[in-house]
């Protein structure tokens, strides 16, 4: 049935009748045949410009590469069309040949199956792009073939003349690929973020400086001392610091002496320890000059101008007077000393006070004896002169002489009294300055050898001497003469003597 259908279809197509015909085997079935072969060629595209009147050429190269050249018509402008492809052998395929003249049908074996494609620029570009895309590069490659000649690269196994062109084009593409890859890497390195570790570790780039908010302000902890006044720290071995500080304290000494302070205060050994803050004085808000007594064992006693951490100090006459008033009116307070050397100064001051008190007591006793002798002499002279007629005038003269003598004695008495008062006033100021010092010292202060009881006894002795001196000075009149009681007694004696003369 199938043969009938095939014959029917074949008979219809070849216009052969339904009669039976003889089938012959061709020369290809003969094993000794070497001259006859049948091949099939399959084209992908057949242009209309192909000239069928002329013969085409088939070139079989190595590795089963086949090039087919088909001539074109002269009117097309292109001499021929080139096809390239490959071939493979047939195994069981046959070819039936029908001869219209004789009506004989011959069967022949097929040898090779050839499949070719037209060599176009587009096709060649696609064939070249495939290896380029595998390499990561898609740049187009221009072929040298334009249809008039064979294209250099499209089908493997082509002629030896076109093979070097394929290799050269491939090498050019690989070179361009390497250059583009390097440029991309350079761009990636150039556009890295600022915080990238590769950029920070790169030797070619400068190391970025990270500014924190703590270092942004202009105020710096290290530079903060530059705005403060220079406050030298004085120790036991720092003799040069004391000498340098003496120049800064010259103005304070002159202002203190101009305000009426004794010279002993201006030349006393007092220095201010650095890093000491000033406490507010009694709530009145005025700045008060603070001194601290210091006696290093190997350094001379000098005075240093105090500085209060950047506050301006304007030492004038009015300020010195206010300073003295505050020191006089402030209650005495016991302050620890900054060094242990104050014991020597306190003992020296107590010895000086004892010697002064003894000298004053001796002067007072001698003065009392002189006063007693003068009084007894005046009374005896007044009694002896009462019998004379001129006793009144003589007594008046003697009284005046006695007054002048007594005035001289009073002057002699007032001189040690003034010396004692000056010394006492100096001791009070030194003691007051010692008490008005700040308690919070950063140099390891120790308490003095004498206690509060010794200070109280010292103050009581000073008060007793002052009271005695006031009593002794109160005996005399304000004009330096004898008191009113002695004058009245003298007048009574003179009047009695005059009455006796009249009788």
From Swiss-Prot:
One Pfam family it belongs to: EAF
Q: Which residues carry this modification: Phosphoserine?
A: 196
The Low complexity compositionally biased stretches are: 202-215, 308-337, 406-437, 454-472, 487-497
Q: Which ranges are annotated Polar residues under compositional bias? A: 119-145, 167-186, 250-273, 298-307
Q: Which domain of life is it from?
A: Eukaryota
Q: Does the keyword Transmembrane apply?
A: no
- The UniProt regions of compositional bias labelled Acidic residues, in chain numbering, are 385-400
Region annotated Disordered, chain positions:
119-220, 250-360, 372-503
Biological process terms from the Gene Ontology for this record are: cellular response to heat; positive regulation of DNA-templated transcription; transcription elongation by RNA polymerase II
Query: Mind listing the UniProt keywords for this protein, alphabetically?
Result: Activator, Developmental protein, Nucleus, Phosphoprotein, Transcription, Transcription regulation
Q: Would I find Nucleus among this entry's keywords?
A: yes
The protein's location, in the record's own words, is: Nucleus
Main localization category: nucleus
Q: Name one GO molecular function term.
A: transcription elongation factor activity
> Gene Ontology terms, cellular component aspect?
nucleoplasm; super elongation complex
Which family does this protein fall into? Answer: Belongs to the EAF family.
Query: What does it do?
Result: Promotes transcriptional elongation by Su(Tpl)/ELL. Essential for development.
This protein is called Ell-associated factor Eaf
Q: Which organism is it from?
A: Drosophila sechellia
